[in-house]
Structure formats: C-alpha cells, structure tokens
Amino acid sequence: IIGVASVITMLAIGQGSKKSIQQQISEMGSNMIMIHPGADMRGGVRQDPSAMQTLKLADYEALRDETNFLSAISPNVSSSGQLIAGNNNYPASVNGVGTEYLDIRQLTVENGEMFTEADIQSSAKVCVIGKTIVDNLFPDGSDPVGKIIRFSKIPLRVVGVLKSKGYNSMGQDQDAVVLAPYTTVMKRLLAVTYLQGVFASALTEDMTDYATEEITEILRRNHKLKASDDDDFTIRTQQELSTMLNSTTDLMT
C-alpha cells in the first residue's frame, strides 16, 4: 500500500506524475481509512511504524465492536522475508490481516477460498497468495491450492489465490502479495502483541468524517489519554491523501 510519505516523495517528480498518483489513491477506495501507531508528525519525520507499539489488538477489537460508521475493518501486521516452495524462492512480505481486508482493498479470491475466522482464532498456518507469488513459486503451472510454502521456516498451506490486479499506476506489482491470519503473523512469525496498522472502510464516502471522529474517541479512551494529551496514533483517509496531493502539487507549480 502506498504510504503518505511515498505520495509526497513521488510528488517531487512534478506535475506530470500527479494524475497517476491520483489514480492510485482512488484505486484504494474512496471510503478507505488507515490508522497507524504513533503521533501525527505532519511536516516532520515519523518514526518507523514497526518500532511503535501504541496500537494493540484490543484497539482493533474495540473498533470492530463499537463503531457505527464502518462497513469493514482489518488489523495489519507484516513480516518480510523469503518464501520457499521446493527449489523455488521469492522475496516477499506476509501481511497479517482479517477476513474483511479483501473488501477494504477490493480483492477477490479466484481459486480456492479466503482463510476463515476459525483460522484466525487458531492462528492457523494458512495463506492466500497473488499471481506473482504463484508464478515464481510454482512455475510449472501446478495448482498451488493445498500446497505448502515456507516463510522463516514456518510452513504455510495455500488455501486460495487472488484474482490478478496487475501493476498499479505507479508501477507497483499488486499481485506480489501474501495474506495470512493476523494472529498467525503476530504469534508465529513476529512474536509481537501490537499492530502496525488498522485498515477500515466507512459505510459511505460521506460518513468518513463521522467514522474518523468515532475511531479517535474510542482509541483515546482505550489509551487513557487526557484532554491535554496529543493522539498517540495517526488516522489518514483516502480523501485526505487526495487533498494533500492537490495542495502539494499546487505549491510546486
């Protein structure tokens, strides 16, 4: 997923790239909301999100159970490494997510199925992979569903293959993806108790502001922040990214 910093960095290329970046932002879905750990350091340097631990599983669960303006929500935690199947290997990140992540990112399982809530509860060693992963780990064209791939010596059984999305407007391969239950990545791959982010979709684009207000209230309460305390998390919306893009490119022209 393109980050805010990536958006702004790419803007240095100039006005010519504005259209392609705008297209990528719109590809995320106009209702998308991204929550990251750590205070908003707009204009400054943000700490590496993986080093910040202010977003916990309890935060995701509270948002999932209490919000009124979200249609889907998923934790996000990822681990980078080498995928191995037989004599084939490929560098990739395993993204730990929930079942609703497909709806948020507008992904579809084409072969097999998405992992289940039961898989999440049991931290099952299962995964869903994109076409690029299939092509590199199973170049003989065999069906990967049911096969075992290894990541950091952990065996993961492939239960589904995502429908191809190809390259996005910025040349990023959207099929080089591996999805696994977030519990599996947290417990078996990283041994952490915190999240790198939470992704959500508002019920409608018009309800995005209501959703972010609600998210802010719940997280501040969960984190026991006083009225004078700054947020120890950052919320970004697709609409906000578009606004940031427009204002930044306008300054440069």
What are these regions (language model features)?
Residues 40-50, 220-232, 236:
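Short, flexible, glycine-rich and Lys/Arg-enriched loop motifs at helix boundaries
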Residues 82, 146-150, 234:
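Residue-level detector of beta-strand face positions
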Residues 34, 71-74, 160, 199, ...:
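Residues embedded in well-ordered beta-strands within globular domains across many folds
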Residues 15-93, 97-103, 135-136, 186-187, ...:
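Hydrophobic, regular-secondary-structure patches
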Residues 95, 99-115, 119, 124-228:
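Mid-to-C-terminal secondary-structure elements
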Residues 1-5, 144, 250-253:
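Internal alpha-helical transmembrane segments of multipass membrane proteins
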Residues 1-19:
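Short, strongly hydrophobic transmembrane alpha-helices
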Residues 215, 226-253:
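Peri-transmembrane interface segments
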